[in-house]
Amino acid sequence: MYKRQSLVFAEHLSNLIEELDDQEFIRFFDTVLEKYDIDEKALLRATNEYTKNKTQKNLEIISQLSEPGWRELFRRLNTISEGTLKLVRMRERIRSLKNDSNNLQFFDRSLLILFKYWFNPSFLVLESIDWTTPANILEKIIAYEAVHEINSWDDLRARLAPTDRKCFAFFHPLMPNEPLIFVEVALTNNMPDSISEVIKIDRPITQEQDINTAVFYSISNCQEGLSGISFGNFLIKNVAHKLKQENDGLDKFVTLSPMPGFSKWLDNKSCLLYTSPSPRD
């Protein structure tokens, strides 16, 4: 009975939080931190008691008092239907408002710590995305593509349907309809000269016996609420291993994906690039 009541309360609270306007949202987290943070006085008393009497029981009391009540609140919110997704969306909203509130900045960091446990790589599921993948997932691939915009369903089909094009995504078991990150791969004969060769709609398909190169040409993080958690390296390693198992002739792995921040850096250096004198022989 208590567990059921707890779930009902958590569901009700989650719905209330979603309905708050921005100022109410900020005030809610101010109140949570004020009422459910660590009881410093009780913790200090317990610490003093432990210094006098170093028992396992006293150490456990310190451990219990060191955990703030709001952390248990997040755990309970995580138990409701789609609770994990709702918490990810909650952190996304926190991040959008955190410049207006020091307490939201605190909860942004605190949720990140929890998420790093909940989204441990060992919990993630690698799935292949192709033209037969359900439409609701494909729509999100179009929306979340962050490197080379997908302009139409024909454009998407050209990236997913041919046998020499692959796409893989990580999912979390509690967010089965939400990709966390995905990578697009072209299987080619040697490295292509340009990205346009890779993503154009009408092109010849590389036959299986001619494939020797895997070109990772786009990788996109999908969830702003999981910002700060690195999935990319783990995804690429898993995909490279899987592709190698499926393609005996594959011996080169390259990337055409843009370097994050490179364009901004280049803009700042452009005047130097154009005005610097040519080096003398």
Where are these regions (language model features)?
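Conserved small/polar residues in nucleotide/adenosyl-binding loops
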Residues: M1-Q5, Y274-D281
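Extended, Lys/Arg-enriched charged tracts that mediate electrostatic binding to polyanionic substrates
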Residues: W118-D193
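N-terminal low-complexity, Ser/Thr- and acidic-residue-enriched intrinsically disordered segments
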Residues: K3-E145
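Short, conserved secondary-structure transition motifs
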Residues: S257-S270
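Active-site-adjacent "gating/activation" loops or surface patches in catalytic cores
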Residues: M175-Q223
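Conserved GNAT acetyl-CoA-binding A-motif
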Residues: E246-L256
